[in-house]
Each structure stands twice: as C-alpha cells, then as structure tokens.
Curated annotation (Swiss-Prot):
Belongs to the YqgF nuclease family. Its main location: cytoplasm. Transmembrane segments: none annotated. This is Putative pre-16S rRNA nuclease. Gene3D superfamilies: YqgF/RNase H-like domain (3.30.420.140).
Length: 141
C-alpha cells in the first residue's frame, strides 16, 4: 500500500476492551481516540462502523499479541478472528501487527509525560502505538 494517502484505524484487541486509534500516512502520526467495551471479545460493531465512517478510514490495523518468545496464546487466536471479522464486515484491508510490549510502552509513555495519576485503561494508547508501528512500516516501504 505504498504511495497512497491512507487513513487507518488501529485496534488493541481485548476480551473486555478494545482500544482504538486513528492515523494517516501523510504525517505518519496517530492519536488515541476511543476505548470500546467488548463482551468476550465481541465489540459493538455499530460503534466500529461509526468510527470508520467518521474518520473515513480506508485501512484497519489490528495488534496481534504473542508471548515474549514469539509463541501464540489464546488471545492471539481471538485477535486474528477479530481481524478477519473486521475485514468481512467492512470490506476494508486489514493489516496485523505484532503488539508485544505495547501496553508496557504505553504505561512508560504515560508516566514519562509527567502524568502521575495511574491510568485506568491504556487500551487506546496501546492502539496508538500499534498504529504508529504500522505507519512506520509503511513509511519504510
């Protein structure tokens, strides 16, 4: 997908919450925008549709969690299933990104900004990091 101005929504998938970020390939930047509730990994698909339409997204990016040794876990399979359902429901290209350590990095950045109050949920910040990783890969293509 090089040489295109793409608007992407990035997702940090979880069984209870799904973080969402938006970014684009013009500046290769991303912003955390939402945390969606999920029930056993099933989101409110209408809210996702609304986000896609609001931001005019033309590509979706899903973080895929692996164990530190690269092995897969139960959540790995659930995140892939979520990515497939996104593609089937909305007909947009879906990219998957290795999301190891994004939550730890999100916490580090939170405190680095001088924010001392412990964040309740960092899912949308993790989605931002996932999307920034994908945007950097697009820049390097």
């Amino acid at each position: 997908m090089p040489n295109q101005n793409l608007i992407a929504l990035g997702f940090d998938f979880g069984m209870k919450r799904i973080g969402v970020a938006v970014g684009q390939t013009v500046t290769h930047s991303a912003n955390a925008i939402a945390i969606l509730k999920a029930q056993d990994g099933v989101p409110d698909w209408e809210k996702i549709k609304m986000l896609i339409e609001t931001w005019h997204a033309n590509v979706l990016v899903v973080g895929i969690p692996y164990n530190m040794d690269g092995s897969e876990q139960t959540l790995t399979f659930a995140a892939r299933k979520f990515a497939r359902k996104l593609q089937m429901r909305f007909g947009l290209p879906v990219s998957m990104v290795d999301e190891r350590l994004t939550t730890i990095e999100a916490k580090r950045q939170w405190y680095e900004q001088g924010l001392t109050k412990r964040p309740q949920h960092l899912d949308n910040y993790a989605a931002k990091l996932i999307l920034e990783q994908w945007l950097q890969e697009q820049k390097n293509e």
